[in-house]
Every structure is written in C-alpha cells, then in structure tokens.
Amino acid sequence: MAEDGINSYMTGPDEQGRFGIFGGRFVSETLMPLILDLEARYEHAKTDPDFWAEMDDLWKNYVGRPSPLYFAPRLTEHLGGAKIYLKRDELNHTGAHKINNVLGQIILARRMGKTRIIAETGAGQHGVATATVCAKFGLKCVVYMGAHDVERQAPNVFRMRLLGAEVVPVTSGRGTLKDAMNDALRDWVTNVRDTFYCIGTVAGPHPYPAMVRDFQSIIGREVRWQLAEQEEGRLPDTLVAAIGGGSNAMGLFHPFLDDPSVRIVGVEAGGKGVDDRMEHCASLTGGRPGVLHGNRTYLLQDADGQILEGFSISAGLDYPGIGPEHAWLHDTGRAEYVSITDAEALEAFQLCCALEGIIPALEPSHALAHVIKIAPTLPRDHIIVMNMCGRGDKDIFTVAKHLGFDMKI
C-alpha cells in the first residue's frame, strides 16, 4: 500500500475535480455557485465529527449496516474453483446500496437549508432511497425516471409514490436513465434557490463523483475487516462489481486501490453484444471520451459526438457513460473492465436463486455472471468478493417476461 500518497490511487481528484483527463466541472453559470457551495460544505463535513457521528448512527440503526459478507458454499462447490463471497448490500433498508450515499447527501442538503430534493433514477433504487430519506426528514421529493424504466420497474414506482415522492416520467430520448438525468439537471437550473440535486452515482460535476464514492466506500471498508475475520487476516484476491455509472463498484474498489495484490474487475452491461450495432451500455469497452452531465468520461457516441442510447435488460446499468474515476482507473490499468450480455446475466440470476436462495437484482447478476466465468479457472484458495448491490424483487416481471413465464397463472 502506498503510504506516502505519492504513488497512491486514492488521492484523487485534484482541486478541479479531475482524475487525470477525466472528471471536471462542466456546468452552467447558474449552477456554479451552488456547486462551489456544495463542495465547500462537503469539505467541511469530511472533517466534522458530528457529521460522521450522525452518518454512523443512521447507517447502523436506519440502514442496518454493516451488511453481511456471506460465503456462498453451494455456488463455490458448483463452480469448482475459487471461494466466492457475496457482500450482501441488498439487505440494506430499501434493498440496495443506494441509501448509503443518499443519507450523506441529504444531511448535507439540510445543512445547506434546502427544502426540496430532486433525483434521477433508472432501476428505481436510487429513487426509492431518496424518497425514503426525504420521508424520514420531512422534505419534498421529486424523482425523474425515464418512461421506459417506469414501465419495467413498476414496483419501485409504486414504492416511491407510497413514500410521498412525485415521480415524473421522462419521455424524451429512449426514456431511460440518461434522459432522466437531463431533466433533473434542467429542474435544478430552474430551482437553485431551494432545491438540492441528489445524484445517485459517481458521475456528474465535481464534487459529486468523489462525494458519492466516499459515502459508498463504507462497502469496501467493511469488506476489509469482515474478510480478515473470516479468512485469518487475508485480503480478497479479486473484487467484482457491476457498473452502470459505477457507485457500488467504486464503493467496493476504492479502499483496495493501493493494495496491488487485489485484482479489480468492473462488469458493464453488454446488452445484445458489444459490436457495431451499439445495443449495449459498455462505455469503456465500446465507447470513447467525451463530456456528458457535467464531467468528462468514456461515452457511447457516434462519429459526430452525439450520445447514443445504448441498451440493457437492466435499468440500473442502462446508461451511456461511466463515472470519471472508473475511466481513469481503466486508462491507468489499475482496474479491468469486461462486459456481460443480457442472456448471461439472466442465467446467473437463475443460478443464484437455485443454489443460494438469493434473488439478485439484474444489476449484480451481471457481476455474478463474470464470477461464474472466472471462478472455475482459479485455485480453490483464491478469494473472490462480489458486491450483491441490490435484490431482485423489482425485476421479477422483467425476468418472467424474458423467460416466457405467465405471471397471471
């Protein structure tokens, strides 16, 4: 581990919010004062014991952290190779990792005197988490969600409305996460005085990528001590996590970036296959650098620089970009990024249900599909830790449709 910080992977971003050539702060003049105020408030909060005391209390008593690190015995035996551990963040309150970050941002919003919270959501988990925390603190909540995602994630739409949130279906573009984020940014520009934008992933203008990463890093910090307890002080050999924007992955990866023995693998949504048809959301595998939603990163785009829609069975991975820190880790070679198709994710989903009695969300099913590929090729003392970042209740209708199961029976 780099202790002097000179050769550390954990010191970014710089003062301009850049990770190498990625990141930054590409926003309108209207938003810049709010962004700078948010950065100042967060920098102060990072060193404020009262802020972290409140976070720790809510993580423990409201979210239910620490989430378990579970050895998957039947999956390990079935694959016949590496030992597989699942970080059970789907057991958090609201059913995913998203609430880890939402709590931090909304505590900051309250400190800034904001009374209205807006958010974007794809799979609906960030929207549910935001609506949940707003209900707890008595704040107005508006969630932008692509119309296509509203249809395929109906259970989460109902949950958000039960929690008091206004859900705004976005019909522009293909009606997915990118379009929801576009409309949320338009709302923010119009209502800067009383509104706080709670971004759900490690994207957006600085300080969001670093701030969301810091809140999600509770995942990796827990894994360090939990695995040490279960495996006599060992570190994981390989970390695997699914990536849309990349917050659950960054939360798992970041505490291990300066441990060179730990292999780090991010799994993107390969959709119908990563080829010239661009029916996928694998930004690092099939994209190139550009600017979207306030930061420079790898994006799916055409020859003229127009952002492409992408495709994935998973609403939470259906995003044509990726967090800038992931782009930097990709280019430096510290992390590797692969893609998994819809069909492979569906197979992994079913195997996890059958062998471990865990119904995963389609997002971590992509990560699990990669684990299924690599585990048999690794020795039995090799330890893989995969982040089970969400539960699959929200996806049962989508999976049933693809498997040809009639839900009306």
Curated annotation (Swiss-Prot):
It holds the Pfam family PALP. It catalyses: (1S,2R)-1-C-(indol-3-yl)glycerol 3-phosphate + L-serine = D-glyceraldehyde 3-phosphate + L-tryptophan + H2O. Its cofactor is pyridoxal 5'-phosphate. Its EC number is 4.2.1.20. PROSITE patterns: TRP_SYNTHASE_BETA. GO terms for molecular function: tryptophan synthase activity. The modification N6-(pyridoxal phosphate)lysine is found at K98. One of its GO terms (cellular component) is cytoplasm. Transmembrane segments: none annotated. Keywords: Amino-acid biosynthesis, Aromatic amino acid biosynthesis, Lyase, Pyridoxal phosphate, Tryptophan biosynthesis. Pathway: Amino-acid biosynthesis; L-tryptophan biosynthesis; L-tryptophan from chorismate: step 5/5. The beta subunit is responsible for the synthesis of L-tryptophan from indole and L-serine. Tetramer of two alpha and two beta chains. Belongs to the TrpB family. This is Tryptophan synthase beta chain. It comes from Cereibacter sphaeroides (strain ATCC 17023 / DSM 158 / JCM 6121 / CCUG 31486 / LMG 2827 / NBRC 12203 / NCIMB 8253 / ATH 2.4.1.). The lineage of its organism: Bacteria, Pseudomonadati, Pseudomonadota, Alphaproteobacteria, Rhodobacterales.
